[in-house]
């Protein structure tokens, strides 16, 4: 996969995105507090001005934000600019009904979705030892498995 996006650079997302950059992935990142993206820029990531700009250049977008509503708002901002077939991977801890709703909503627009919450806390995120619980199509999982292993 040529270009990946990462949305949400908090306690969990920042180290997760950092591992992607460290493993050689071409990462474009965004955070609602722009200063949180600066350390990632220094590692070699591109920082997008907004979610639309991120979605326009990425084949897969990983989200790690706080709540169902945050995921929904991010998806609303990204889908108009994203290419058909873009794969959205949500690492946020969302409700099962929200995850199903995101999948349905994205599928209807020609996008793909994996629900992939993580466990292991901030220590696991920094160490690169998180456990992921991935729900979605096996084919989509196989596409991003090498990225998730980073």
Placement of each model-derived feature along the sequence:
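Short gly/ser/thr-rich secondary-structure transition/capping motifs
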Residues: 42-48, 72-73, 113-116
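Rossmann-fold dinucleotide-binding core
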Residues: 4, 93-150
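Active-site-adjacent beta-strand anchor residues
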Residues: 30, 64, 92, 134-135
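A general structural motif
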Residues: 1, 84-85, 129
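NAD(P)+-binding Rossmann beta1-loop-alpha1 motif at the extreme N-terminus of oxidoreductases
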Residues: 1-63, 122
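Short amphipathic alpha-helical segments
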Residues: 17-19, 41, 73-76, 100-104, ...
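Rossmann-fold NAD(P) dinucleotide-binding segment
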Residues: 51-112
């Amino acid at each position: 996969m040529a270009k990946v996006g990462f949305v949400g650079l908090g306690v969990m997302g920042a180290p997760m995105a950092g591992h992607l950059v460290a493993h050689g992935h071409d990462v474009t990142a965004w955070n609602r507090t722009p200063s949180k993206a600066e350390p990632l820029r220094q590692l070699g990531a591109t920082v997008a001005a907004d979610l639309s700009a991120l979605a326009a250049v990425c084949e897969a977008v990983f989200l790690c934000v706080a709540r169902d509503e945050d995921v929904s708002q991010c998806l609303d901002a990204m889908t108009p600019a994203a290419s058909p077939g873009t794969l959205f991977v949500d690492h946020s801890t969302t409700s099962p009904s929200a995850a199903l709703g995101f999948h349905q909503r994205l599928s209807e627009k020609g996008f793909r979705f994996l629900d992939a919450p993580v466990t292991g806390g901030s220590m696991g995120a920094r160490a690169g030892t998180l456990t992921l619980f991935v729900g979605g199509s096996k084919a989509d999982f196989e596409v991003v498995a090498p990225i998730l292993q980073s």
